[in-house]
Amino acid sequence: MQVILTQDVEKVGRRGDIVDVSRGYVRNYLVPRGLAEVATPAKLEEARRRMEEAAERERRLAERAEEIAETLNKSVITIEARTGEDERLFGSVTAANIAEAIEKARGIHLDRRKIRLEEPIRSLGTHQVPVQVHGEIEASVKVIVVPKL
């Protein structure tokens, strides 16, 4: 029996999926718990339309992410950091600092968790920092850490 899942169901499918399951499973488990609804022709058409809209939305997001990645690959971000007499940093430059600098310089808001720093930057100079823009789309930003005067 075909049903449209209204929520993610373990070992069955994700929300919005159209799946074939046994009648007993539908009648005794999925429908009473509000996890699925029986797939009528009208509901199937509605679900297909929603899936097409989601695919289009995902395609637009991927296009935008490609543009952002291209911009980031060309970007050089300068971050000023406090240093001691021996040119060592007080503290470090973190992913949050880099995200803030990118937003100020390029107007691109990135979540700090998308910046793939294995360890915070603790030295002056030029560093290549990988950024996961969207899904599998990645970019590399050139970050220059200079002493604050």
Curated annotation (Swiss-Prot):
SUPFAM superfamilies: L9 N-domain-like, Ribosomal protein L9 C-domain. Keywords: Ribonucleoprotein, Ribosomal protein, RNA-binding, rRNA-binding. GO terms for molecular function: rRNA binding; structural constituent of ribosome. It comes from the Bacteria. It holds the Pfam family Ribosomal_L9_N. GO terms for cellular component: ribonucleoprotein complex; ribosome. InterPro entries: Ribosomal_bL9, Ribosomal_bL9/RNase_H1_N, Ribosomal_bL9_bac/chp, Ribosomal_bL9_C, Ribosomal_bL9_C_sf, Ribosomal_bL9_N, Ribosomal_bL9_N_sf. One of its GO terms (biological process) is translation. Binds to the 23S rRNA. NCBIfam families: L9 (TIGR00158). Belongs to the bacterial ribosomal protein bL9 family. This is Large ribosomal subunit protein bL9. The lineage of its organism: Bacteria, Bacillati, Actinomycetota, Rubrobacteria, Rubrobacterales.
